């Protein structure tokens, strides 16, 4: 399937499984009359495969070592991309950032690394399913920076176009999206 056909098919899946209209309170606390819940798309076999493929292709030239983001939205996405990257002989390891460190065990903020792995000096992409203000991805980026990682990009599947671009610019974080909310609001 061509990139444009994959993108169109994924948009259809998002529209059918993950986009809705109706009053909702977003993670940012804002109210909205439309929403995206990408978990049904990320956990659908075809949706996961297309998200991984399009994301992997968007990152192929960025020489990325790790991909991850804030739990929960980034977890299935980072895992799917890591698996596909292995199959494409261009491995990108996955991790996730806890919203708050566990109060037992190793008390880690960044999870998924082995005892011998570190993000120190590694090129990292922060992924997110849906971005509104950018707050969640910025929180993940701060944890990665504290662990020594170098953020090369924040990549979201859907940008709600509600201030994230400006927030990422202010935080010194390059930002791209696969889709913009306006693409779904037209239909």
Swiss-Prot record:
Cofactors needed by this protein, per the record, are: Mg(2+)
Coiled-coil region: none
For this entry, list what GO says about its biological process: 'de novo' UMP biosynthetic process; pyrimidine nucleobase biosynthetic process
Residues holding 5-phospho-alpha-D-ribose 1-diphosphate: 98-99, 102, 104, 128-136
Q: Which reaction does it catalyse?
A: orotidine 5'-phosphate + diphosphate = orotate + 5-phospho-alpha-D-ribose 1-diphosphate
Residue sites binding orotate per the record? 132, 160
Disulfide linkages recorded for this protein, renumbered to the chain, are none
> Which keywords does the record carry?
Glycosyltransferase, Magnesium, Pyrimidine biosynthesis, Transferase
Biological or metabolic pathway of the protein: Pyrimidine metabolism; UMP biosynthesis via de novo pathway; UMP from orotate: step 1/2
State the superkingdom: Bacteria
Q: Which InterPro entries would you find in this protein's record?
A: OPRT, Or_phspho_trans_dom, PRibTrfase_dom, PRTase-like
EC number(s) reported in the record: 2.4.2.10
Family as reported in the entry's similarity comment: Belongs to the purine/pyrimidine phosphoribosyltransferase family. PyrE subfamily.
Q: What does the subunit section of this Swiss-Prot or TrEMBL entry state? A: Homodimer.
Q: What is this protein called?
A: Orotate phosphoribosyltransferase
């Amino acid at each position: 399937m061509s990139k444009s056909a994959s993108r169109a098919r994924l948009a259809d899946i998002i529209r059918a499984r993950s986009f809705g209209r109706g009053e909702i309170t977003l993670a940012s606390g804002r109210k909205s009359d439309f929403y995206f819940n990408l978990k049904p798309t990320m956990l659908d076999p075809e949706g996961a495969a297309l998200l991984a493929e399009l994301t992997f292709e968007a990152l192929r030239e960025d020489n990325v070592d790790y991909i991850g983001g804030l739990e929960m939205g980034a977890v299935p996405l980072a895992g799917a991309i890591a698996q596909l990257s292995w199959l494409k002989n261009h491995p990108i390891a996955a991790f996730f950032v806890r919203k708050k460190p566990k109060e037992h065990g190793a008390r880690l903020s960044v999870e998924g690394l082995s005892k011998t792995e570190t993000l120190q000096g590694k090129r990292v992409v922060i992924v997110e399913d849906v971005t509104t203000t950018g707050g969640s991805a910025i929180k993940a980026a701060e944890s990665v920076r504290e662990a020594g990682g170098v953020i090369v990009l924040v990549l979201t599947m859907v940008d709600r176009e509600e201030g994230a671009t400006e927030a990422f610019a202010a935080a010194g974080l390059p930002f791209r999206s696969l889709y913009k909310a306006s693409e779904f609001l037209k239909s």
